Amino acid sequence: MAEQNCEIAWFSALCDDDYEFLGVPDKYLQSSWEHCRNIVLRAEEGGFDNILLPSGYQLGLDTTAFAAAVATQVRRIKLLWATRMGEDWPPQLARRIATLDRILGPNAEGTGGRLNVNIISSDMPGETIASGPRYARATEIMKIVRTLLNGEHLDFQGEFYKLKLDPPRIGTISGRCPAFYFGGLSHDARECAAEASDVYLMWPDTMDKVRETIADMKARAANYGRTLRFGYRVHVVVRETEDEARAYADRLLSKLDDEAGKAIREKSLDAKNFGVQRQQELRGAADGDGFVEENLWTGIGRARSGCGAAIVGTPDQVLAKLRAYQAEGIEAFILSGYPHAQEADMFARYVLPHINHGPLNI
């Protein structure tokens, strides 16, 4: 059987989340236009299909301004632009997406644009909304934006928004709404994803849990008459030998103060959500070296909220792990490593040439 195709994305550390030693700030790795642009350019040069531009409020760069600027610097790679639901009036969000897509330009085939959207539904500063209403609002926003960017007249009467509008004059290159990538583990998050997103993103977990989550999300989407694609967000440490990879992982934590790591985790607006709690559970279930299953190392979660584990091993081991996820239904990977520019080069050298990959077509 031929190897299935998948999308391989990297991560640009816009939120002051780049280190040589986890938890130890380095002025040369702090988020700046030059540094984060360099990560994007290295990812494009290395052959990655897509790159996540994350969103944060307390640290780093503004995602929208960065995306618009870096869109003029790249020629092939897609951008996965993160945006938080509720920070924009939905029709304005639709216009912003269309504008970014136009700046970024067409894909290699000339069949559409190169922008994807990472939908985030966390609380915002000064705002606390219960999970149910917050995800219901996100669902409404995605439906509104999709209708407008598909070039259709909008007549929407929801709980949060009541709108009658024609689509914006400026549309996307394809004339359709870009793909929505969305993640969340709670019941409300899963229902939101099933009803309105395109790619359901998972953070690191055991293979059994990945299999269980995919089955659950397929069933939920079917209840809405829809199908989902599946993505996996994970860090990676790849070296020529397993000993070298494990030694590098240990080195990342060699200067970490546990209190400093805790402070970093608690700064995040999503520090108390279901997904973060699950990452904590994985660390608690790991062995003495931090591995919760073969080649899945949870040490990174000691110094960051959110995605808290890494695939650690040789090129063959990393490739085997990715293929195992593919066999369960994962079609898109969002990878990262510390420091991000260096580790993009490592993955591009050792693993990427051996993967049948390309942009996810939705």
Curated annotation (Swiss-Prot):
SUPFAM superfamilies: Bacterial luciferase-like. It catalyses: 6-sulfo-D-quinovose + FMNH2 + O2 = 6-dehydro-D-glucose + FMN + sulfite + H2O + 2 H(+). GO terms for molecular function: alkanesulfonate monooxygenase activity. It is an enzyme of class 1 (oxidoreductase). Keywords: Carbohydrate metabolism, Flavoprotein, FMN, Monooxygenase, Oxidoreductase. Its EC number is 1.14.14.181. Pfam families: Bac_luciferase (PF00296). It comes from the Bacteria. GO terms for biological process: alkanesulfonate catabolic process. The keyword Nuclease does not apply. The keyword Transcription does not apply. Part of the alkanesulfonate monooxygenase (sulfo-ASMO) pathway, a D-sulfoquinovose degradation pathway that enables the complete utilization of all carbons within sulfoquinovose (SQ) with concomitant production of inorganic sulfite. Catalyzes the oxidative desulfurization of sulfoquinovose to sulfite and 6-dehydro-D-glucose. Belongs to the SsuD family. This is Sulfoquinovose monooxygenase. It comes from Novosphingobium aromaticivorans (strain ATCC 700278 / DSM 12444 / CCUG 56034 / CIP 105152 / NBRC 16084 / F199).
